[in-house]
Amino acid sequence: MYPHRRILGLKHHLCILKLLDNINDPSDLKKLSNDQLPQLCQEIRAFFIEKILKNGGHFSANLGVVELTVVLHYIFNFKIDRLVWDVGHQAYIHKLLTGRKKEFERIRKLGGIAGFPKIDESEYDHFGTGRSSTSISAILGMAEAAMLDNKPHKHIAVIGDGSLTGGMAFEALNNLGTSNANVLVIINDNQIGIDPNSGAINHHLNTINEKINFFKTLGLAYEGPIDGHDMNSLIHSLEKSRDVKTPQILHIRTIKGKGYLPAEKAQTEWHSVSYVKIDPSKSNTDNPKPSKFQDVFGHTLLELAEKDQRIVGITPAMPSGSSMKVL
């Protein structure tokens, strides 16, 4: 039925999803015991891998936040609390747990659910995303507005270490450091955006000291780094943060592509998948697709650079996506 299982050696199947079958919204998730959550995460990965390899979509980033997403919805109430996913391509598990499980056959298709959080799609999508480094500013604005209305609920931003290098994220951290807003920023540190990260922030996160670091210098409470796939650690840290009403940073370390070995080994290649990639028999070799704009740009720039040594390429933090890797 699913040729990609044979092609990729996929062993997951959806015959028995004892826990996930009974979860239609976060209220069902909250009925589970802590001990049942690891099994639920296994079932979520099986479901997600099956559906996305069949239908296409953002892949490895979502596998890296399964445990985090489950625990967030287990502890907080996002009908009241607020949650913003930076970029948003890692929000598929969030969608799965918030009443959109049956829509995964039509994800990113006409009439189906979007591949990013979308405000008019669900009451659980609090901010429309799709671009990098906007989450902290957005959640801080919501939290400041809530303070004016005397609403004490939690405001959470999940931002990757790659997105943390964007200028808007620094502007937001600058403001957050002097705010009393009820904000939790979760740094999802997986060492990679679409391509491996670089720069001073990347180095700082790799060598960070819990007592003395960039975030504490800004006046922010910091915890971490903790294992973002360890359910007990996540529950402990997030339950503790729930009772704190001032800005906090929680630094977690995750593996992009967690639970699917090909994606763990080739994280850039498995950032997203398409059905043609999954099943080569479906590709139309008689009518090949035209070259992508970025590929034309990358190869043209290379040709020009070979003739003019003064040309320097500046990548937008993703040499693969911009096709500047050819340089």
Identify what each model region corresponds to.
Residues 19-25, 46-51, 114-126, 155, ...:
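Gly-rich Lys/Arg/Thr-decorated short loops/hinges at beta-loop-alpha junctions or inter-strand turns
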Residues 165, 172, 177-202:
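Mobile "lid/hinge" segments at catalytic clefts and subdomain interfaces of large enzymes
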Residues 58-179, 293, 303-327:
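Cofactor-binding active-site loop characterized by glycine-rich and histidine/acidic residues
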Residues 91-93, 164-166, 191-195, 222, ...:
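Flexible loop/turn segments at secondary-structure boundaries
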Residues 229-284:
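Terminal amphipathic helices with adjacent charged low-complexity linkers/tails
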Residues 41, 45-48, 57-65, 215, ...:
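Cofactor-pocket helix-loop regions in the catalytic cores of large enzyme subunits
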Residues 16-97, 216, 225-234, 248-251:
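N-terminal amphipathic, basic-rich helices that act as targeting or association modules
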Residues 149-153, 199-237:
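Conserved thiamine diphosphate
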